[in-house]
Swiss-Prot record:
Residue span(s) of domain ABC transmembrane type-1: 283-561, 933-1182
This protein's name: ABC multidrug transporter B
ABC transporter domain segment(s): 626-853, 1219-1449
Keyword Cell membrane: yes
TM ranges: 30-50, 70-90, 102-122, 128-148, 165-185, 273-295, 314-334, 387-407, 411-431, 501-521, 541-561, 940-960, 978-998, 1016-1036, 1040-1060, 1125-1145, 1156-1176
Disulfide cysteine pairs (residue numbers): none
GO BP annotation list: transmembrane transport
Range of residues in the leader sequence: none
Known function: Pleiotropic ABC efflux transporter that may be involved in A.fumigatus adaptation to azoles such as vorizonazole.
UniProt-listed Pfam families: ABC_membrane, ABC_tran, TMD0_ABC
Any one GO cellular component localisation term in the record: membrane
Length: 1458
C-alpha cells in the first residue's frame, strides 16, 4: 500500500503495548513492555500503596503468633526472591540484553518492592491470626503473570544474556510458587497462649475460604454422627450478638425517627463494610458471566478455522480461558453469597437483640408476646429472604445493561425488541411492587392474631381440657388460620404475576428478537446473515438477559417485602418505653414525708410496735422504705384513675398488709409501687430499688425447681436450704422423682397450685432483697402449710425478718392482719380509707374492725433445717439418664417429603422440556437457512413461537394451581393436624415440652410452609428439569461429551450424599435452636413485671444474647455449607465446560459448528440453571424441614385418646351425679404415681369436700375425673357409666368445672361465656348478673366487648368463671380450689351462687379454707395420693385424732388463740 509504514519488528513491538503480529511468536503473546508495566509494576504498585496502611494497622496490634520455623522460612524465601530479582535487574542493565525502555526501571522497582513485602510478611505473620490476604492475592496473580512473561522470554531469547534472564525469571517463578505455599499455611497450631478458641473460619487463609475447606471437619462430623449444636463451630467475635446489638443500637439512638425506613437505613450503615465486601466478587461474577457469550462466539469461529499452529495456539488459549472463567465464576459466586449471608447473620443478630431489648422496656399494656414473637419469626425471616438477593438488584441491572449492549453488537437494531420485552416485564414488576408491602403487612397481621391466640391456648391447656373446650378452640383457631390463608391469596397472586413476568423475557425475547432480526436482514437482502454464530451467540445473550431479569424481579419483590418487615419492626421499636414514675434514692436513706391529712387513722402506736420488733431484727426502722404522697394512679391516663389521692408511708423493715374488697385496686397499688402503673398526680418514693415480687398468679420459666428458685442470683447452699425449708418444700422434693431437679414445665404446668406458689415465694425470699412485695401469695396454700410458711418467712424469727426486709403483702384474706405492723385499707373507689396498726384501726371502727380480730400469737422460732440433709441426693436428686432418641432421618433424609411436592407440581415440568427444545429448534432453523436462505422462515418461526407460548401458558397455569390452590390447602391441612395433635396431647406432654417449642411449629414452621416453601418448590423442580434437559442436549450435540456424564452423575451423587447428611441435620438444628430463644422471649414478656421488679433485665438480656448466639450457629453454618455446595456444583459445570472445549479443540473438523453451538450454549444455560437450581434447592431443603418437623410432631406426640374410649353415652348423661372410684391408681408419667388405690363412693346430689396438705393429690383426684391423668389401674363410674370407655372430650363437656386459675380466652365477653355459641343472650346476661358483674361489663360496652378491656380483678375473674359454669349442662360440679384466691366478700358471693344455682348438683370441692366445707355432706382427706379418711365433717371433727380434725385445728388455731 502506497505511503504505508513497514511492519514493526518483534523487538519494536515488544517496546509497545500492542499484541504481536502473527509473524512474531505466532501472534499469541503479549508484548514485553505490557508484561513489565501492566503485569509487573501495576500489581506491585497497588500492593505497595496499600502496604503502609496495613503495616500501620498491624503495628498497634499485639503479637498473636509465635516466631516458628514458618516465619524464618518466609523471610528466607522473600530474601532469596529479592536477591534473585536484584541479579535479574543487573542482567537487564547489561548492554547485550534485549530490553525495552522500561526494563531496567521496572526490575529495579520490583527488587525494592520485594524487600518491602518481606517486612510486611513478618508483620502479617506475627500480628495476624490469618494468612495475609494481600500477599496471597499478589503472589497468586503475579505468579500467573510471571509464567506468561517467562514464556515470552524463552520464545524471544536470542543470546546468552537473554537466556540467562529467562533462567533467572524461571527461578523467580519457582520461588514465588514456594512463597505462595508458605504464605498460605495457616497459623492455628502456632498461636500464642490466650489466642486459642478461634473458629476455623477465623484462622482460614484465602484458598481455604475461597473453596470452603474450613467446613470439611463439619462435614466429617455430620457424615459420621448425629450432630448437636455443641458440635458446631463457635461464632467469631464479629458475629457476637452483643457486639452487633451495640453497633446497631448506638446508631439507632443517634438518628431521628422521621422516616419509616430509618431502621433499614441504619442497618445498611451499621453493616456497610460487611455488605460492601460482597461487591467486588459480585462485580467479578457479572464480568465473568459475560465472558461466556464471547467465548462461545470465539469457539464457534474457531470450529470452522483451518488446522495450523496459530489456530492450535488459539485452541489451547480457549481451554485456559474456559478454565479461568468457569472456576472464577464458581469462586466469585461462592464468596459473594457467603459474604452476603454473613451480613444477613449480622443483621439478624442485631435486629433480634433490639426487638428483645425493646420488649423488655415496654409497658405492661404494650407487652404482647405473640406480636413480638411474630416480629422475631415471620418478619425476621422476610428480612433474611430479602437480603439474600440484595446485591442481585444492582448486579442484575448491570448484567442486563451489558446483555443489551452485546445484543446490539450482534443483532443491531433488532435488539430493541428483546429490550422492549424486558422493559415491559420490568415495568409490570415495578407496578406490582407497590402492592407488595401493604398486602404483606395485612397477611403478617393475620399471622400475628393467630399466633397470639395460639400462645394464649398453650398457656391455658389445663383449663381448656377441664372445661371440654377442645372443639371450640379448634374451631376458633382454625378459623383464624383459614382467614389468614384467604388474606394471603392477595399476596400470592402478586407472586404468580411476578413469576410470569420474570419468565416472559426468557421465553418471548428470543422469539421476537430473532424474528425481527430475520425480517430486517431480509429487507436488506441479507437472508444468509442468520447463521450458526449469530443464532447461538444471540441465544446465549438472551439467556444472560432473561436470567438476570428473572432474578432481578424476584430480588426486588423479596427486598421490598423485607422493607415492609423493617417498617413493622421499626414501628414496634418506636413504641413508648415503660415510664417508671417512682423517685429512687441517690443515697442509702432519707427522711420520710410528713403524713397528709385524709381519711386515715393517726397511729402513733404503729411506730412503737415496729420499734419494739426491730429489737429482733437488729436494724433501725425510723427511715421509710416507701412513701406515697397524694398519688393518683391510672392504667390509662386518659381514663378514670384506679387509685386516687393515696398518701402512705411504710417503715423500713416493717410488715405492711394491703386489704380491701375485690376489685378495689390492691394489685394495682403493688404494681404502682413497682413502677408499672403511671402516676397521674403526686409522687412515690423508694429508699431502695432492691425489690423482690411474687405475683398473684405465679410466674415461672421452664427450668428445674432449683433454677427457678435461684434464678439470676448466685447459688448459696446454706441459704438455699434455709429458704427451701422455710417455704415447706422439703417434703415436696422428697415426693418428686427428681427432687429439686424436676423440670417444672412452661408456666409451672408440672406443679400443683400450692407448689407453684411456694416456689415463687422461695424465689422472692432467696433473692435477699430490701423490699419484698407479695400479691396474695399465701392464698393458694392449705391452712397448715400457709401457717408454717407464713411464720417461717414473716414471723418474728422468719427469714425475711432476719434479713430486715420490708414486707408488703396484698391479701384477699384478713386473718394475717394481727401480725402486720401497718394495715392499709382500700375502698371500692380506689381511696385509702384506713391506715394504721390493727389496734388503732380496731379502736377507730371501720372495715378492719368488722373482722373482730385480736392480738397475734407469734410462733416460737422455727427449727433450723439440716443443710447437710438437704444437700443429699435423696432430696436433690439428679436427672435420671434418659436415652436420646436419635432420628436417623436427620442424616439420611426422607424422600417421601420431596415426592409429596413432586406430586403437587403435576405436569408443570412438561413446559420446561418444551422451553428447552427451542435451542434445538433454532439450530435446525439456522442450518435450514444456511442451505436455503429464507426458504421456510415462517414455518420455523411459527413453531418457535408456539413452543414458547405453550410453555408460558403451562407455567402460569401450573404456578397458579400450586400457589393459589394447592399451597393454601396444604397449609390448612398442616395447621389442622398440628392443632389437633396439640389439643389431643396428654397433660404430661405439656409438662415435659417447652411451650416455645410448640409455638415455634405454629409460627416459624407454618410461616415457612406458607411463604417460602411454595416458591422454592416451584423453582427447584422447574430448574431441575431444565438442567436435565440441558445435559441431554449437550450429550446429543457431542457424543464424546456424553461419555463424561456418568462421571458427572457419580460426582454429583457423591457430593449430595456428603452434603445432605450434614445439611439435613443443620436444617433441624436451625429450627430447633430457635425454640429456646422464642421460649425465653415469651417467658420474659409474660413475666415482665416480676423481672423488672427483681431488676433482672440485664441478666436476662445476657441470656438472650447467649440463646441468640446459640441459634446463630446452625443458622450461619447452614448457609455456609450451602455455599460449599454451590461452589462444588460450579466446579462440576466447569469440568463439563472444559471437557467440551477440549473435545472441540482436539476433534476440530469432525464436529459441526451447529453441534458445537448447541453444546456450548447449553453449557452456558446449564451454568445459569445450576446456579438457580442450587439457590432454589437449598431454600427448598431448608424450608422442607418444617414439613418434616410437623409430620414428625404429629406422628410422635401420642394422643391422650385411647382406642378403647369409643362407647356412646345418652344425651342427658350424667342425669343424677352418682360417682364411684374403684381402686383407682393414676400417674402423669410412667413410674410417677400421683394416686394410689383410691376407692370412693359419692351419691347423687352430695356435696363432697376434698382436703389435704399441699401436694397430697387433691387436684390429681379431680383431674382423674376429667381423665387428665392416666389411670394405671381401677375405674371411675358416673351414673353407672365407666368413664374409661367413653371419649374424654365427651366427659369434659358433660362435667362442670371451675379451676383455681381463671380461664379467660382471647376475645369477647360473649365468647368467653359461651365458647360454642349455644346460649341465648338473655341466659348469658342472667348468669353474669347472678355473680354481680353485669353492671361493670355493661359500663365497658356489653357482651361484645373484648374481655381484656374490662380489667377484671383476680376475684372478679373467678366470679366470671362461676357465671360461665351456670350456663353449662350436667349434674356434676367440680371446684378445684376455686375460692382460694378471693376475699371474704367474693367468697361469700361464690358460696351463695353455688348453693342457689347448683343445689341439685353433685359437688366435689377441693378446699384449703376448711370452714367453707363444714356444711358439706362428706369430706375426703388425701395424703400422698391416697384416701386416708372420709366421712361426715361434723363426725370427723368430733373424732379425736382424725386427719380432718387435725387439719381443721391447724387452720383454725389462730382463731382459737384469738
Amino acid at each position: 500500500m502506497t505511503g504505508s509504514s513497514p511492519p514493526l519488528s518483534c523487538q519494536q513491538v515488544d517496546n509497545t503495548l500492542h499484541i504481536p503480529a502473527l509473524s512474531c511468536r505466532g501472534g499469541f503473546d503479549f508484548s514485553l513492555l505490557f508484561e513489565e508495566l501492566i503485569l509487573g509494576i501495576l500489581p506491585l504498585g497497588i500492593v505497595l500503596i496499600i502496604a503502609p496502611f496495613r503495616l500501620y494497622h498491624l503495628f498497634w496490634r499485639q503479637a498473636k503468633v509465635v516466631a516458628s520455623w514458618l516465619l524464618w522460612a518466609k523471610i528466607t524465601a522473600w530474601l532469596a526472591l529479592g536477591i534473585v530479582q536484584l541479579v535479574l535487574a543487573v542482567y537487564w542493565a547489561r548492554p547485550a540484553a534485549t530490553r525495552t525502555q522500561a526494563s531496567i526501571a521496572a526490575n529495579a522497582i520490583i527488587t525494592v518492592g520485594f524487600f518491602i513485602l518481606c517486612l510486611l510478611s513478618c508483620a502479617e505473620h506475627l500480628r495476624s491470626t490469618t494468612p495475609s490476604f494481600l500477599l496471597n492475592i499478589y503472589l497468586l496473580f503475579t505468579l500467573l503473570f510471571d509464567i506468561a512473561k517467562t514464556r515470552t522470554l524463552w520464545l524471544r531469547s536470542s543470546g546468552q544474556t537473554d537466556e540467562t534472564i529467562a533462567i533467572l525469571t524461571s527461578v523467580t517463578v519457582g520461588i514465588k510458587f514456594l512463597l505462595l505455599i508458605l504464605e498460605a499455611v495457616e497459623k492455628r497450631h502456632i498461636l500464642r497462649k490466650g489466642q486459642s478458641g478461634y473458629p476455623p473460619e477465623a484462622t482460614a487463609g484465602i484458598f481455604n475460604r475461597s473453596f470452603f475447606l474450613w467446613l470439611n471437619p463439619l462435614f466429617r462430623s455430620g457424615f459420621s454422627k448425629i450432630l448437636d449444636v455443641e458440635d458446631l463451630f463457635d461464632l467469631d467475635k464479629h458475629l457476637s450478638s452483643r457486639r452487633l446489638y451495640s453497633t446497631l443500637e448506638t446508631l439507632w439512638d443517634k438518628v431521628p425517627k422521621k422516616n419509616p425506613n430509618t431502621l433499614l437505613f441504619i442497618s445498611l450503615k451499621a453493616f456497610k463494610w460487611p455488605l460492601l465486601s460482597a461487591v467486588p466478587p459480585r462485580a467479578c461474577l457479572a464480568a465473568l458471566n459475560f465472558c461466556q457469550p464471547l467465548l462461545l462466539h470465539r469457539s464457534l469461529a474457531f470450529a470452522t478455522e483451518p488446522v495450523n499452529n496459530h489456530t492450535n495456539s488459539i485452541g489451547y488459549g480457549l481451554i485456559g480461558a474456559y478454565i479461568l472463567v468457569y472456576i472464577g465464576m464458581g469462586v466469585t459466586m461462592g464468596q459473594y453469597q457467603h459474604m452476603t449471608y454473613r451480613t444477613i447473620t449480622m443483621v439478624r443478630g442485631g435486629v433480634v437483640s433490639m426487638i428483645y431489648n425493646k420488649a423488655s422496656r415496654l409497658g405492661i399494656k404494650d407487652a404482647d408476646p405473640a406480636a413480638s414473637l411474630t416480629l422475631m419469626s415471620a418478619d425476621i425471616e422476610r428480612i433474611v429472604q430479602g437480603w439474600q438477593t440484595i446485591h442481585d438488584i444492582w448486579g442484575n441491572a448491570a448484567e442486563i445493561a451489558l446483555a443489551i449492549y452485546l445484543l446490539e453488537r450482534e443483532l443491531g437494531v433488532a435488539c430493541v425488541v428483546p429490550v422492549g420485552v424486558a422493559l415491559v416485564a420490568l415495568i409490570g414488576c415495578l407496578i406490582t411492587l407497590s402492592f407488595v408491602v401493604a398486602r404483606q403487612a395485612v397477611w403478617l397481621e393475620a399471622i400475628e392474631r393467630r399466633i397470639s391466640s395460639t400462645a394464649s391456648m398453650l398457656s391455658s391447656m389445663k383449663g381448656i381440657k377441664m372445661l371440654g373446650l377442645k372443639s371450640a378452640i379448634m374451631k376458633s383457631l382454625h378459623g383464624l388460620r383459614l382467614e389468614e390463608l384467604e388474606i394471603s391469596k392477595k399476596f400470592r397472586r402478586l407472586l404468580v404475576w411476578n413469576m410470569a413476568l420474570g419468565w416472559t423475557t426468557r421465553i418471548f425475547a428470543p422469539i421476537f428478537a430473532l424474528g425481527a432480526f430475520y425480517g430486517i436482514m431480509h429487507s436488506r437482502g441479507k437472508d444468509s446473515a442468520f447463521d450458526m454464530s449469530t443464532a447461538y451467540t444471540s441465544l446465549s445473550l438472551f439467556a444472560l438477559l432473561a436470567d438476570p431479569l428473572l432474578s432481578l424481579v424476584m430480588a426486588l419483590m423479596t427486598f421490598v417485602g423485607s422493607i415492609g418487615s423493617f417498617s413493622r419492626i421499626q414501628e414496634f421499636l418506636e413504641k413508648d418505653d415503660h415510664v417508671d414514675c417512682r423517685l429512687k434514692p441517690l443515697h442509702a436513706s432519707y427522711e420520710s414525708f410528713e403524713p397528709k391529712a385524709m381519711v386515715l387513722v393517726d397511729d402513733s402506736d404503729a411506730t412503737e410496735t415496729a420499734s419494739d420488733r426491730s429489737i429482733h431484727r437488729g436494724k433501725s426502722v425510723y427511715h421509710d422504705a416507701l412513701t406515697v404522697k397524694n398519688a393518683t394512679f391510672a392504667w390509662n391516663v386518659e381514663k378514670e384513675p384506679v387509685l386516687k389521692g393515696l398518701t402512705i408511708s411504710i417503715a423500713r423493715g416493717s410488715f405492711t398488709m394491703i386489704v380491701g374488697p375485690s376489685g378495689c385496686g390492691k394489685s394495682t397499688l403493688l404494681k404502682a409501687i413497682l413502677g408499672e402503673v403511671p402516676c397521674v398526680n403526686g409522687e412515690i418514693r423508694l429508699s431502695s430499688d432492691s425489690i423482690a415480687f411474687c405475683d398473684q398468679i405465679p410466674w415461672h420459666m421452664n427450668a428445674t425447681i432449683r433454677e427457678s428458685i435461684v434464678a439470676m442470683s448466685s447459688f448459696d447452699k446454706e441459704w438455699y436450704a434455709s429458704v427451701v425449708h422455710a417455704c415447706g418444700l422439703v417434703q415436696d422434693f422428697e415426693q418428686l422423682p427428681r427432687g429439686d431437679e424436676t423440670v417444672i414445665g412452661s408456666k409451672g404446668i408440672a406443679l400443683s397450685g400450692g407448689q407453684s406458689q411456694r416456689i415463687a415465694l422461695a424465689r422472692a425470699v432467696y433473692a435477699r432483697k430490701d423490699i419484698v412485695i407479695l400479691d396474695d401469695a399465701f392464698s393458694g396454700l392449705d391452712a397448715a402449710t400457709e401457717d408454717y410458711v407464713f411464720h417461717s418467712l414473716v414471723g418474728i424469727h422468719g427469714l425475711l425478718r432476719k434479713i430486715n426486709s420490708t414486707i408488703i403483702v396484698a391479701s384477699s384474706s384478713a386473718k394475717r392482719l394481727p401480725y402486720a405492723d401497718q394495715i392499709v385499707v382500700l375502698d371500692k373507689m380506689g381511696y385509702a380509707s384506713e391506715q394504721g396498726s390493727l389496734k388503732a384501726l380496731n379502736a377507730a371502727g371501720g372495715y378492719v374492725s368488722s373482722f373482730g380480730l385480736g392480738s397475734p400469737e407469734w410462733k416460737s422460732e422455727i427449727d433450723k433445717p439440716s443443710v447437710t440433709d438437704l444437700a443429699q441426693p435423696k432430696i436433690l436428686r439428679p436427672n435420671r439418664t434418659e436415652a436420646i432418641k436419635e432420628d436417623p432421618r436427620r442424616q439420611s433424609g426422607d424422600l417421601s417429603i420431596y415426592l409429596y411436592y413432586i406430586r403437587s407440581i403435576g405436569w408443570l415440568p412438561t413446559r420446561l422440556v418444551l422451553t428447552d427444545m427451542t435451542g434445538i429448534w433454532v439450530k435446525w432453523w439456522a442450518i435450514s437457512n444456511e442451505e436455503d436462505p429464507n426458504g421456510r422462515t415462517g414455518y420455523y418461526l411459527g413453531i418457535y413461537a408456539m413452543l414458547g407460548a405453550v410453555g408460558m401458558l403451562s407455567l402460569i397455569i401450573g404456578c397458579w394451581e400450586m400457589v393459589i390452590n394447592m399451597v393454601p390447602k396444604s397449609g390448612e391441612s398442616f395447621h389442622r393436624k398440628l392443632l389437633a395433635t396439640v389439643l389431643n396431647a396428654p397433660m404430661s406432654f405439656f409438662a415435659a415440652t417447652d411451650s416455645g417449642s410448640i409455638l415455634n411449629r405454629f409460627s416459624q414452621d407454618l410461616q415457612l410452609i406458607d411463604m417460602e416453601l411454595p416458591v422454592a418448590a416451584i423453582n427447584t423442580f422447574a430448574t431441575l428439569i431444565l438442567c436435565l434437559a440441558q445435559m441431554i442436549l449437550m450429550g446429543i450435540a457431542s457424543r464424546y461429551a456424553a461419555i463424561s456424564f456418568p462421571l458427572v452423575i457419580l460426582a454429583v451423587y457423591s457430593i449430595q450424599k456428603v452434603y445432605l447428611r450434614t445439611s439435613r441435620q443443620l436444617r433441624f438444628l436451625d429450627l430447633e435452636a430457635k425454640a429456646p430463644l422464642y421460649s425465653h422471649f415469651s417467658d420474659c414478656l409474660n413475666g415482665l413485671v416480676t423481672l423488672r421488679a427483681f431488676g433482672w433485665q440485664p441478666a436476662l438480656e445476657d441470656k438472650n444474647f447467649q440463646l441468640l448466639d446459640y441459634s446463630q450457629r446452625p443458622f450461619y453454618l447452614l448457609y455456609a455449607i450451602q455455599r460449599w455446595l454451590t461452589l462444588t456444583l460450579d466446579m462440576v459445570v466447569a469440568a463439563i465446560a472444559v471437557i467440551l472445549i477440549v473435545l472441540v479443540v482436539t476433534l476440530r473438523g469432525t464436529i459441526s459448528a451447529g453441534d458445537v453451538g448447541v453444546a456450548l450454549l447449553n453449557v452456558i444455560l446449564f451454568s445459569q440453571s445450576i446456579k438457580l437450581l442450587v439457590t432454589f434447592w437449598t431454600n427448598l431443603e431448608t424450608h422442607i424441614g418444617s414439613i418434616v418437623r410437623i409430620r414428625s410432631f404429629t406422628e410422635t406426640v401420642s394422643s391422650e385418646n385411647l382406642p378403647t374410649e369409643k362407647d356412646d353415652v345418652p344425651p342427658n348423661w350424667p342425669w343424677g351425679g352418682d360417682i364411684e372410684f374403684k381402686s383407682v391408681s393414676a400417674e402423669y408419667r410412667p413410674s410417677e404415681p400421683v394416686l394410689g388405690d383410691v376407692s370412693l363412693t359419692i351419691k347423687s346430689g352430695e356435696k363432697v369436700g376434698i382436703c389435704g396438705r399441699t401436694g397430697s393429690g387433691k387436684t390429681s383426684l379431680i383431674m382423674s375425673l376429667f381423665r387428665m391423668v392416666e389411670l394405671s389401674s381401677g375405674s371411675i363410674h358416673i351414673d353407672g357409666v365407666d368413664i374409661t370407655k367413653i371419649p374424654r372430650q365427651e366427659i369434659r363437656s358433660r362435667i362442670n368445672g371451675v379451676s383455681q386459675s381463671p380461664l379467660l380466652i382471647k376475645g369477647s365477653i360473649r365468647r368467653n361465656m359461651d365458647p360454642n355459641g349455644s346460649y341465648a343472650e338473655k341466659a348469658i346476661i342472667e348468669a353474669i348478673k347472678s355473680v354481680g358483674l353485669y353492671t361493670k361489663i355493661q359500663e365497658k360496652g356489653g357482651l361484645d366487648t373484648d374481655i381484656s378491656e374490662v380489667f377484671l380483678s383476680q376475684g372478679q375473674q373467678q366470679l366470671f368463671c362461676l357465671a360461665r359454669a351456670i350456663l353449662r349442662p350436667g349434674k356434676v360440679l367440680v371446684l378445684d380450689e376455686a375460692t382460694s384466691n378471693v376475699d371474704a366478700k367474693t367468697d361469700e358471693i361464690m358460696q351463695r351462687v353455688i348453693r342457689e344455682k347448683f343445689c341439685t348438683h353433685t359437688i366435689l370441692a377441693v378446699a384449703h379454707k376448711l370452714e367453707t366445707i363444714l356444711d358439706y355432706d362428706k369430706v375426703v382427706v388425701l395424703d400422698a395420693g391416697r384416701v386416708v379418711e372420709s366421712g361426715d365433717p361434723c363426725t370427723l371433727l368430733s373424732t379425736e385424732g382424725s386427719y380432718f380434725s387435725r387439719l381443721y385445728a391447724s387452720s383454725m388455731a389462730l382463731a382459737e388463740e384469738q
